Amino acid sequence: MVRLREIPRTATFAWSPGADSPLIATGTRAGAVDVDFSNETCLELWDLGLSREDVSGELQPAAKIDTDSGFNDIAWTESDDNKRGVIAGALENGSLDLWDADKLLNGSSDSVISRSTKHSGAIKALQFNPKHSNLLATGGAKGELYISDLNNVANPYRLGTAARADDIECLDWNKKVAHILVTGSNAGFVTVWDVKSKKESLTLNNVGRKAVSAVAWDPEKPTRLVTATPLESDPMICVWDLRNSHAPERTLRGHESGVLSLSWCTQDPDLLLSSGKDNRTLCWNPQTGYAYGEFPVVTNWTFQTRWNPHNPNFFATASFDGRISIQTIQNTSTDTAKAIADQNQALDGEDFFAKAQSQPQVSSFSLPKAPKWLERPCGATFGFGGRVVSVGLTEKGSRTSTIKITPFEVDEAVGKSTETFENALKEGDLRSICETRATNAATEEEKADWKVIEALISENPRKSLVDYLGFQDKADEAADSLAKLGLGKDEDVNGEPAKESRGPGAKKHKRLQSMFDANPEGDSFLSDLAASKGAKTNNPFQIFNGSESEAEKGITRALLVGDFEKALDVALKEDRMSDAFMIAICGGQKCIEKAQEHYFSKQTDSPNYVRLLASIVGKNLWDVVHNADLSNWKEVMAALCTFAEEKEFADLCEALGDRLEEQVRSSDEKSARKDASFCFLAGSKLEKVVAIWIEELAENEQKAIETGANDTTFSIHVHALQSLIEKVTIFRQVSKFQDTEHTKDSDWKLGMLYDKYIEYADVVATHGRLQVAQKYLDLVPEKHPEAEIARNRIKLAMRQAAPQRTQTTAPATRATRTPMGRPMPQPSAYQPQSTFAPAAPAAPNTYAPPTAAPNPYAPAAPAAAAPAPPQPVNPLLPHRRMAVFLLLLRANNQSPATVTTYTTATNLPAWNDLPEGFMKPPTSRRATPATAAAPITSPFPNQSPPIGHGPPPPGAPPTQRTPSVPPPPKGTAPPPRMSSPLAGAPPMASMAPPPAAAPAPAPPANPYATLPQSPPMASSMAPPASIPRGPSPYNAPPTAPPPSNRYAPSPAAQAASPQLQTRAPVPPPPQAAASPYAPQPMAQPPAANPYAPSTPPMVAPPMQQGPPPPQAGGSRPSTANSQRKAAPPPPKYPPGDRSHIPAEAMPVFEILSADMQRVKSRAPSSFKAQVDDAERRLNILFDHLNNEDLLKPNTIADMAELARAIQARDYDTARAIHVDIMTNRMDECGQWMVGVKRLISMSRATP
């Protein structure tokens, strides 16, 4: 709440009508005494200047005129004859004065319009008709009620003729029916008048005829109104429906003293202001009786409050402390008030009184829903994933809305083409995709790209690339040339030409082997030759004939001994190249390479094909790639496809493409870019070809825009982007591309492609194709910052509700019930058996559920009664008697409960019920001590008393009847709980009672309050019986570290006393004063806690000088060695990361975090530490969910059900699931379970 302005007057006031800058008219309140004891009375007009930021200094009146009497009421209405309207004043001397507001502001001396003195006494109230602004109703002493017409003020007419002894204190015109008026008197009469017929319609049956100080009509329902009583003994506001005038429909109780003023907001009937003698101004929902909260408290009575008629964001409140406060209904932080409080704390001594600043008490609140004038009747917004969310009223005039989610696509063609392409990919027909895209290509470059990709799909990609370059036809032409030279003909032995075969495939064999295909005797040649191997020929020769040169002799000798390498050296030395090649063929690969090297070294001025041949033979195609003229790039590419080794092919293609790309940059020759793209495609260099494609994308997009196509710029860009993504996708599949940089966190070679993937994913996601978007985002490195954000959005948009948990029969640990009466003792599953019964620990059990539900409505409890004097221990208790007691106790547990004095809860929805959700405990300045309730013998009022033997010991508290408990607030009752074993059994007469204990703390009045700690018990004394008390959902966790054994009792239970001492009976637990607004306590005792140390059987512990030795396996103080544990493995993801939470666990994170934020925003600031601790523990749970560790799938499903129960405010189900998880799955629990438990309690206590 922001206090915008303050008018330093004790005066009644009225807001100016109309939409102009708001003004306020004030009239000195009759009977009020100013600070300076001045008796001056006047009418003043104030310009609030709400548009001004500078609010320093005190407001000064814009106009002022003295009057001869004080004001009881004032009104301001619009008028056709007066520019700024007419102001009417109800004066204490019985005069009705009218002023022209415009003349007052201008300082004119004739601002008084008229004066009427028809009233014989003081005029207490007046109001202009909201439908007819010329009609003015005035009411005052002796029941006088007049209706005046501004056109004839001197002749008003009176409603009701009989003289009355009571005074009309308030009146109000009906907001829907113009001729209906209601009045309230100090005698308790609430009368409805029909002004048209000038008679009384009906009188409400105001029980007890309590005085009425204010009345107000419902602005929308003409039959509903509210009344207020100024009595300090019974302050209340009654909501009436004229259709049942015998009793109020609802009573609103929140004020501590009489109510003096009401103001019902005309723009929102769910907002009602009330102010009164308790110095407070409250805001209500009169439709439900719920009190939203309280505005800052002042130091004296607040006698008038009014909404601004035009802008209800503002309202004003007048009080007898000499101020009229103009405030907003919006809540803001109280940093200023805190700063002043801190400053005052630093002052001491006389400086405090000299320098301390006063600040009104602040009690801020926020409206749970927006006021009606701020509500949007309709609205729409675009949602991620191709959705439009629209909101509209179900019917005109209602406040219920319908939410619709409809699919939306910016460009339907994008969605259709995306689906078509993805379906084609699933079918795997890549060739048809390439053919279709090549046919529909808009540019030659795009068509060439698709043709090359199509060539790469074939079984022999290199041959297909050569064919695409056009070298297949050139090879055929070469074969034809050989045929023309005669190399293609052959003759048989008879000299006749061979017959050629000219079949369909004959053209394919026009190389050297084709010369033998036409010889019909070719197949028998080898067989004939083999048959003639042993035949002698008539052709003798000499190895040496004497005419040989030395070189020839050396070659011959080397050949005879098989030394081909020496023979080759001689031939090369003599430059006999033909002989050298023949010898090299016989000598093997080494000789061949030597001959080739010698040959190429001699060919310095040889033709170009020789250099090409040298590169091919030497397997060094880099010379061709780096040095060949780029005009012959196709020939170079053909050579690479034909002769390059597989491991070098990609790099050779990249080098050739780089040369072509460099040529594009140096000469700006765009045609070479297509050639470079071919090389990069052939070499499967995606990072290089993508850069070209992205450059082409921008150029093609610009051309399409310049050509004036009908498509929008968005559609043009998306289609170009889609074409790029399709080419990249097909190329990756064809080339089997593997991204080796997917794990890097920066400096990616494909960085530009990743950006396009992210952009395309966003486009297809906005068209509703979330699966496709996720597919392409998965191709982007995980550590890409923009991709991570996009993935999270896609993941959230694709999340699915967790499967519903099958409802099965609840295990016994979750819903164990006992017969009505005293609960059965339940042995702990983790308590070791011992013949020694230790004293119950004095420390509270942090895992035990509370013994009673917190009561946010109960007043503070009184101090407990003084404990009874101690009683000596009887060490001679017979064992037989104790056994009889245990048998009787067990039998009593199984017997039905005795009849208790609980009041039956009622649930009346409308009449005479109390306001829901609001009952403020009295403040300290008006608090009165509550009367202590009678003590009870058991902490559970409906528990049967145990059967004892003999009269109670002296000094034992007498048994008294449990006081009746009023009905609970609306809502279903929580399920019954189990009780800890024998936690509440009273001491037997023959047993040694526990020692006297200090009074236990009372249940807190504030649902967020931290419970005061109990005084410490003696180390060896048993604690008193359990006391039902309401725990605060914001209590901090126990600070003491838990024992190493999670089933061991708390540290307080481990302390042993050297000697037992005398004990006294248990003092009765303190009970809060019976509150008529408190909810009814639970009918069943609280559930047993399987993790708490079990309470020992109810037997007197034997006398001994020290504790017994610890049992084997029991809890021992942990040593340094036992506390050393292996360091846990590092988490998979850093704390706070929520992007990897699986879909089935997402509801847990979303619902619990949202509810935690709701609680955090509404919890009292004094409990910030407790709320932050609960939030920290919930974040531990979310980290486990994000890392997918600790929690198993069934536990995650249970947690999802628990979250949905919290969302539905079904806290009993949520707590039952929580207990079940803690009971049966302790290995999955940790610190986060305490946070979940706290959230359940906080959420239940937070409105």
Curated annotation (Swiss-Prot):
Keyword Disulfide bond applies: no
GO cellular component, as recorded: COPII vesicle coat; endoplasmic reticulum exit site; endoplasmic reticulum membrane
GO biological process entries: COPII-coated vesicle cargo loading; endoplasmic reticulum organization; protein transport
Compositionally biased intervals (Basic and acidic residues): 487-502
Entry-linked InterPro entries: SEC31-like, SRA1/Sec31, WD40/YVTN_repeat-like_dom_sf, WD40_repeat_dom_sf, WD40_rpt
Species this protein is from: Aspergillus terreus (strain NIH 2624 / FGSC A1156)
WD repeats: 5-47, 66-109, 118-158, 163-203, 207-250, 254-294, 297-337, 381-406
Protein name: Protein transport protein sec31
Gene Ontology molecular-function annotations: structural molecule activity
